[in-house]
Regions:
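Short, structured helix-loop boundary elements
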Residues: 13-17, 36, 71, 75, ...
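Short helix-to-loop capping/linker segments positioned immediately adjacent to catalytic or ligand/cofactor-binding
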Residues: 101-102, 110, 172-178, 194-202
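A structural signal for short hydrophobic beta-strand segments in well-ordered beta-sheet cores
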Residues: 63-65, 112-113, 215
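Amphipathic alpha-helical effector-binding/dimerization core
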Residues: 68-169
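Cysteine/selenocysteine-centered motifs that mediate thiol-based redox chemistry or coordinate metal-sulfur cofactors
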Residues: 161-164, 170-173, 248-267
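N-terminal helix-turn-helix
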Residues: 2-93, 100, 253-260
């Protein structure tokens, strides 16, 4: 095979992999099922060409046909890969027991998240026994600057990076309380850095309040955020004042497990 033929074959293979990967990214919590027409349109391909990529993903267990509702959904192999990926996140390994203890102490939902492409990605939850199990889900994403978890993470990133991220992905407000201008965002992130915690009062969901603190790794870098959340009427000012030390101490205990040795209330 000539160099030109080899180059063309490699390019075609690369394009195939890229398009197959793109198909997987088109599925979301809001759109868990896609028709062949949906995927062909998003790929800007004919349905016959799109189907070849879908068939390849089906064969690998990454997509499956939804026989009851029609269309396609993510396949069982994705669940297996997600489990593997979750178990490789170091902060999650060290956080789970601490999150359970915090949940039992305060009787609120406890959340753990990391920053991904301008969003927070939830990687663990500890839910009180009397809460509905469908209320939350690992893998859920939310706009970072609209959540206490996200603002905590953004507060420890360079401002130029934060601004560039928002400019790239947009404000995407959830409620009238969501931050939608750079001056307010910059001021709030500075306050969060100074006080060491963040509050979301109806910025993600009206009627819900969230309180978050940063988690550092052995180098001192903020790698995740921990939060407690509940109905706004439950997280009163008095309850926040009572619960904040426990939230920060739990975050510090997780950081200690990650090898962080300085500047924590726990130490």
């Amino acid at each position: 095979m000539s160099r030109t033929s080899t180059s063309v074959a490699a390019s075609a293979k690369s394009q195939t992999i890229e398009r197959a990967a793109l198909i997987l990214t088109y599925f979301s919590a809001e759109e868990p099922r896609k028709t062949l027409a949906d995927l062909a349109r998003q790929l800007d391909l004919s349905q016959s060409t799109a189907y070849r990529y879908i068939a390849t993903l089906q064969a690998a267990g990454l997509l499956e046909r939804d026989e009851q509702r029609g269309g396609y959904r993510l396949g069982p192999r994705v669940i297996e890969l997600s489990f593997i990926a979750l178990n490789q996140i170091e902060v999650r390994k060290h956080a789970l027991d601490e999150m359970d203890r915090l949940r039992d102490r305060l009787n609120v939902m406890v959340n753990l998240a990391i920053l991904v492409e301008g969003d927070v990605l939830h990687i663990a939850h500890a839910v009180p026994a009397d809460w509905p199990r469908w209320y939350t889900a690992v893998g859920r994403r939310a706009v970072a600057h609209c959540t206490a978890l996200g603002k905590t993470l953004l507060a420890h990133r360079p401002w130029d990076e934060v601004r560039a991220t928002v400019e790239r992905y947009g404000w995407r407000p959830y409620t009238s309380r969501s931050i939608q201008d750079f001056d307010r965002l910059a001021a709030e992130l500075e306050t969060i850095r100074e006080q060491g915690y963040s509050i979301d009062s109806g910025e993600r969901n009206q009627g819900t309040t969230c309180l978050a603190a940063p988690i550092r790794d052995h180098s001192g870098s903020v790698v995740a955020a921990l939060s407690v959340s509940s109905k706004a009427e439950r997280l009163t000012d008095a309850f926040r004042e009572e619960s904040l030390p426990h939230v920060r101490e739990t975050a510090d205990r997780i950081a200690f497990r990650l090898g962080y040795l300085g500047g924590t209330g726990y130490l």
